[in-house]
């Protein structure tokens, strides 16, 4: 199924009351919607078949026209981070597609800035009023990825820089030297992730998120694959 099913509010973590009605978790709609749009955009880039781009744009436009916010409990930060960067990357792949009306693309940019970016920034700055090391690394990393991706697709160097600065020197476990917290070099050429003591799935999620961050930065001429004497490589 290549259709998407946008929701007015992306809800993650707990049911919420919106306009007098209880709305349960529905974040899977955003996860699927962003993934579908990205895969369609990628197929367009690879095969140069406008049918894929047209469907991806149709799906993204539906989200822009429908979704006005991200909510829930503290897990709202995961929704904003994960789906924020995924939607942004899909849009970036499609920005050269001539069939995307410039006004619709502008609306998409503004949508990212209104719906996802404020939640990304709030987590990186305030982290729900907890100790700055309270949340696992993937929470910080996904919000860094979203901040950087949104900065790129909206042509906002200031937002891009916010994400990069946090990745280098931020206070949360999303900072690279905290996400990869134990470095065995120079004796051994490997390093250990902050999430390694949790489980394999979340540890590999961190690997994937840092890979996304590094590739986003690479597209802008910044090399974080080799940053800090190849720290990411040692973590892999």
Regions found by a protein language model. Give the residues of each.
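Extracellular glycan-targeting catalytic surfaces
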Residues: 1-129, 141, 145, 165-168, ...
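Short, functional N-terminal and low-complexity linear motifs
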Residues: 51-52, 204-207
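Acidic, Ser/Thr-rich low-complexity linear motifs
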Residues: 72-76, 134, 179-181
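Short, contiguous, pocket-lining structural segments
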Residues: 79, 104, 108-111, 131-142, ...
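Aromatic-anchored, glycine/proline-accented short structural segments
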Residues: 146-202
């Amino acid at each position: 199924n290549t259709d998407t099913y946008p929701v007015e509010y992306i809800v993650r973590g707990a049911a919420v009351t919106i306009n007098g009605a209880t709305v349960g978790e529905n974040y899977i709609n955003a996860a699927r919607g962003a993934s579908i749009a990205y895969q369609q955009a990628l197929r367009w880039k690879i095969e140069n078949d406008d049918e894929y781009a047209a469907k991806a744009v149709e799906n993204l436009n539906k989200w822009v026209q429908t979704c006005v916010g991200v909510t829930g409990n503290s897990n709202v930060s995961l929704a904003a981070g994960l789906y924020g960067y995924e939607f942004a990357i899909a849009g970036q792949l499609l920005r050269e597609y001539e069939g995307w009306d410039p006004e619709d693309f502008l609306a998409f940019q503004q949508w990212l800035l209104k719906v996802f970016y404020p939640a990304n920034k709030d987590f990186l700055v305030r982290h729900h009023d907890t100790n700055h090391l309270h949340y696992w690394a993937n929470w910080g990393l996904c919000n860094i990825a979203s901040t950087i991706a949104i900065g790129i697709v909206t042509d906002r160097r200031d937002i891009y820089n916010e994400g990069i600065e946090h990745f280098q020197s931020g206070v949360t476990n999303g900072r690279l030297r905290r996400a990869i917290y134990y470095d065995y070099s120079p004796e051994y050429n490997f390093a250990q992730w902050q999430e390694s003591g949790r489980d394999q799935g979340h540890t590999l999620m961190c690997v994937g998120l840092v890979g996304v961050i590094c590739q986003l930065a690479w597209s802008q001429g910044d090399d974080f694959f080799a940053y800090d004497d190849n720290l990411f490589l040692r973590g892999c």
